[in-house]
Each structure stands twice: as structure tokens, then as C-alpha cells.
């Protein structure tokens, strides 16, 4: 699905260098089809890097996807130029009267911060409440999963004593589920989190269906039966070097982090890591766009009435 983005967005040239099909707004205007409208609430500090990662995964399908970037934190960013934020991001007030086919809420480095201490916690709650009536399907990633489980289901924050960092094996529980269609029986995906997601907790306190688990019994991928919300507790969008960059950052900060599990060849940080999760990440986002967004969203977004088969 060629993603439709502003002509000047840095991701255009970045992704074209990888031979990723990106359609600029000026070119897309000549195609007489309705693109899917996908809103990305980017909570990560390095916003340009995160844009590149998610846009790469949203790009590999035959329909247009019109991307809108959203920010809810008005504080000055230390990692993203103000000019970039002003040019390519909207505020919630700009879009609260609009409807969207899809919403992606990214992770955030807030695993050890209590929810009420998050500077934009009220805004997160506002967006999630708004999405119930204005978005066909929402995908939550990593920390956003923990936030959504608290807001939507009242589940208290669950925190690990040590950070889960590395590339872990997972297995699917429902081979015919639409979100895992085409998945191998077992697959690899990266994690980088303090948040804890015991599968038993999800089963006991929600009506969500767990579709894939880690080998240790943590929930990795789960969703509502009506396809309106989906959750992925890892980082399938990560680049090959992202975990290495996080590890070196923590080393330089004197945090004495563990070497990310199953990531560096021979467990040696001097060796160049390889992405072993890329096909899984692409298939996950393609399935979400197709089965959870495109197949149930109304043609006329002025009337939000997602329909199941």
C-alpha cells in the first residue's frame, strides 16, 4: 500500500533509498480512489526515526494510505527539530472533528513512570476516548498497550524488576486468526520494555483474544473480537540497529544494562546485529490494514459504522 505523505517529509527520501513505494500528496491527488486515513500518535522522543520505521511497515500494499502525524505533548522536544514538528504534525484540536480508518499509538520510554506522572496522561485518555467514535481500528504498541489496558480495562500498571530487551521467540495460538494469517507457527520479534504483560492477566480481566505469546507465557499480540482494537507488546517496527543504540545509550549512562538477548551474534556487542523479525513485522501491519481496517471501515467516513463479516 503506497503511503501518502507530504512531499517534503524526510521519510520520503529515506524510504525511497530502500526502494519503498512512497506516494507524495501531489502525485496521489491524481488517483481517483479513497485512501485509507491513518493517524499516528507518535510518542517516541526521536520522532523522525520512529516515522521512518512505521511508514516502512505501512507501505507494502496496493491501496493508498493517507498518513497524518499527531502530537499531544506541547513541551519543547530535545530530539526532534521544532520546524519538523510544526510542518508535519497536527494537534488534537486540529483533528478531533475528523474520522479516521486507523490509529496507531506508538510506544514511549515511560516504563518506570507512574501513569499519573506522565506529562500528557490526560491527553492520552482524551485521545483514546475520542477514538471510540472516530476511528475504525486502533493499534497500540509496547508502552501504549499498557496505557490502553489501564484506561480501557482498569488494569493496574504491571512492571518488571528488570528490563526485557532482546529478540524473543513467539508462537501463535490461533493459526486461522486474521491478524496472524500467513505467520509461521513460531516467529521472532524484538522487545524493549519494563512493562509486564502476563497472558493470565489479559485473560482474567479482559475479553480480548490472545493471538500470540512469548515462550515465557507473556501476551505478545491480542485483539478485540470486533477488530476495533489490537495490541502488540513488542517492537516489530524496530530497525536492525535500534536495540544496539538503546543498549549503548544505557551503557554510556552508567546503567549497566544486560546485553540484549538473542540479538548480537555470539552475544558480543562488537558484532553487527541482523534483523530477524522483518518479515513478521511487515505481515503484521499488512494484516492489520487489510482485515482490521480496510475490510470493516465505511466507505464514507462521515458515518462511522464499522461492520464485521
Swiss-Prot record:
The active site is at residues 142, 235, 237. One of its GO terms (cellular component) is cytoplasm. One of its GO terms (biological process) is L-methionine biosynthetic process from homoserine via O-succinyl-L-homoserine and cystathionine. Transfers a succinyl group from succinyl-CoA to L-homoserine, forming succinyl-L-homoserine. It comes from Shigella flexneri serotype 5b (strain 8401). The keyword Amino-acid biosynthesis applies. Disulfide bonds: none annotated. Substrate binds at residues 163, 192, 249. Its main location: cytoplasm. It is an enzyme of class 2 (transferase). GO terms for molecular function: homoserine O-acetyltransferase activity; homoserine O-succinyltransferase activity. Homodimer. HAMAP family: MetA_acyltransf (MF_00295). InterPro entries: Class_I_gatase-like (IPR029062), HST_MetA (IPR005697), MetA_family (IPR033752). The record marks 192 as: Important for substrate specificity. It is found in: Cytoplasm. It catalyses: L-homoserine + succinyl-CoA = O-succinyl-L-homoserine + CoA. Its EC number is 2.3.1.46. Transmembrane segments: none annotated. The record marks 111 as: Important for acyl-CoA specificity. Pathway: Amino-acid biosynthesis; L-methionine biosynthesis via de novo pathway; O-succinyl-L-homoserine from L-homoserine: step 1/1. Keywords: Acyltransferase, Amino-acid biosynthesis, Cytoplasm, Methionine biosynthesis, Transferase. This is Homoserine O-succinyltransferase. Belongs to the MetA family. The keyword Transmembrane helix does not apply.
